Amino acid sequence: MLSLVGRVASASASGALRGLNPLAALPQAHLLLRTAPAGVHPARDYAAQSSAAPKAGTATGQIVAVIGAVVDVQFDEGLPPILNALEVQGRESRLVLEVAQHLGESTVRTIAMDGTEGLVRGQKVLDSGAPIKIPVGPETLGRIMNVIGEPIDERGPIKTKQFAPIHAEAPEFIEMSVEQEILVTGIKVVDLLAPYAKGGKIGLFGGAGVGKTVLIMELINNVAKAHGGYSVFAGVGERTREGNDLYHEMIESGVINLKDATSKVALVYGQMNEPPGARARVALTGLTVAEYFRDQEGQDVLLFIDNIFRFTQAGSEVSALLGRIPSAVGYQPTLATDMGTMQERITTTKKGSITSVQAIYVPADDLTDPAPATTFAHLDATTVLSRAIAELGIYPAVDPLDSTSRIMDPNIVGSEHYDVARGVQKILQDYKSLQDIIAILGMDELSEEDKLTVSRARKIQRFLSQPFQVAEVFTGHMGKLVPLKETIKGFQQILAGDYDHLPEQAFYMVGPIEEAVAKADKLAEEHGS
């Protein structure tokens, strides 16, 4: 009888190892990836350390099984806690494993942060004694690192003495700031119609080729100039080519400076070809870099995550490898917890703020898919880039009617800003509803009032365009950063009819309204001569 029980237990354990028996993982459900270890607290320890690698622990184990990105390690003594980083010994390249489950019999199940090719059973593994720690501080600006903090830009080591664990708790309630404040971006259409809240989360929706990258670079540039703030770009499941292009475009536009220490952005990449463990953690690495600037330097940091869907997708792959029972549409059962644990760390404290702009891929354009639906619950604003607007040559191609913001409230932005924004949206909506009539009957059949609406709407549409500083090399137009007061004043005067006499092309690709007036005078001179 005992031998039968032993065989059943053995079969169950081996089935769990192969991922065949998801029920075998259930007793360890409370030990999964979603909780931070006891030693990790928002009051981070940024103490100087002498070497790039975190201080090693003493426990040594050996690999007993390798199933793709999942590696089981047995320790004779000193079992490492959940989320600890382990390092495989005797390899040329550094391979870090993160503890995900305790299986019993002194064995831990880990997720590899890099490829497991060449691993063999019996190989030695050392416990680092802490979660994955990465370099933080001003030295990370202008550099590209991977999920475990190694530089991947071929420019030597990141010379910082400060390291931080990628797992941390969200700031406590007493540390949070309750003030609602606009983060002025200097981009007219964003500041007027869908303003970003300091410490808020913005969803950036846009297909290929509508200007997502240029908008991201302009935001990085403007935040550095207007607020003196830094930015962090986390490429989660990105195409390597796109990440490479972005890096070189940033060098060309001056956002990254290779000659001196004036770079404004740190880059963290976990590309599409990386194992799921790396893609599931790289967003946390980027967030940790941003948290240092917020908590230690009191900065207003901009954190870009491209693409937040890949974070969820990687979590789903990891979950399946760990043998958990899948939830709706095959996603991990801890989807909401994984997302919430990360998103709650993106917030405003009394020291500074992290404002996050997250590119969101919507699978099969289905907004009810659990991955985007879970993300929407955390968003404060949405910026929708429209191909139809890009085709008109209006950049940034932000859709003024589809983009929304939670802080578009007269109690937060003020009644003047609110009234002007709603007035602009109303006139654009009226123009949209008149377009069918214009297409069939022509402009001549409209009433005088409707003709005026169309004329003003077309001027507003063009005035929502703006030359970007990072795109000067392509457009030949000098970039403009427009203060919020100037933006409100300009649109207010167009709505009031103060510029009904100016031609609509005068409003295209200008900064404040005074430039439109000057451009109209210049056009009149050219036509007069």
Swiss-Prot record:
Protein name per its UniProtKB record: ATP synthase F(1) complex catalytic subunit beta, mitochondrial
Sites of N6-acetyllysine modification: 124, 133, 161, 198, 259, 264, 426, 480, 485, 522
Function: Catalytic subunit beta, of the soluble F(1) head domain within the mitochondrial ATP synthase complex (F(1)F(0) ATP synthase or complex V) that produces ATP from ADP and phosphate inorganique in the presence of a proton gradient across the membrane which is generated by electron transport complexes of the respiratory chain. With the non-catalytic subunit alpha (ATP5F1A), forms the catalytic core in the F(1) domain.
Chief site of localization: mitochondrion
Annotated transit peptide: 1-46
CDD domains membership: ATP-synt_F1_beta_C, ATP-synt_F1_beta_N, F1-ATPase_beta_CD
Binding residue positions for ATP: 209, 211-214, 239
Organism this protein belongs to: Rattus norvegicus
Subunit structure, as described in the record: Homotrimer. Component of the ATP synthase complex composed at least of ATP5F1A/subunit alpha, ATP5F1B/subunit beta, ATP5MC1/subunit c (homooctomer), MT-ATP6/subunit a, MT-ATP8/subunit 8, ATP5ME/subunit e, ATP5MF/subunit f, ATP5MG/subunit g, ATP5MK/subunit k, ATP5MJ/subunit j, ATP5F1C/subunit gamma, ATP5F1D/subunit delta, ATP5F1E/subunit epsilon, ATP5PF/subunit F6, ATP5PB/subunit b, ATP5PD/subunit d, ATP5PO/subunit OSCP.
Residues that bind ADP: 209-214
Binding residue positions for phosphate: 209-213
Glycosylation sites: 106
UniProt keywords, alphabetically: Acetylation, ATP synthesis, ATP-binding, CF(1), Glycoprotein, Hydrogen ion transport, Ion transport, Magnesium, Membrane, Metal-binding, Mitochondrion, Mitochondrion inner membrane, Nucleotide-binding, Phosphoprotein, Transit peptide, Translocase, Transport
GO terms for MF: ADP binding; angiostatin binding; ATP binding; ATP hydrolysis activity; calcium ion binding; lipoprotein particle receptor activity; MHC class I protein binding; proton-transporting ATP synthase activity, rotational mechanism
Modified residues (Phosphoserine): 415, 433, 529
Binding sites annotated in the UniProt record for Mg(2+) 2: 238
Family annotation (InterPro entries): AAA+_ATPase, ATP-synt_VA_C, ATP_synth_F1_bsu, ATPase_a/bsu_AS, ATPase_alpha/beta_chains, ATPase_F1/V1/A1_a/bsu_N, ATPase_F1/V1/A1_a/bsu_N_sf, ATPase_F1/V1/A1_a/bsu_nucl-bd
Modified residues (N6-succinyllysine): 124, 133, 161, 259, 264, 522
Family of the protein in this entry: Belongs to the ATPase alpha/beta chains family.
Membrane topology: Peripheral membrane protein
Classification via PANTHER family: ATP SYNTHASE, ATP SYNTHASE SUBUNIT BETA, MITOCHONDRIAL
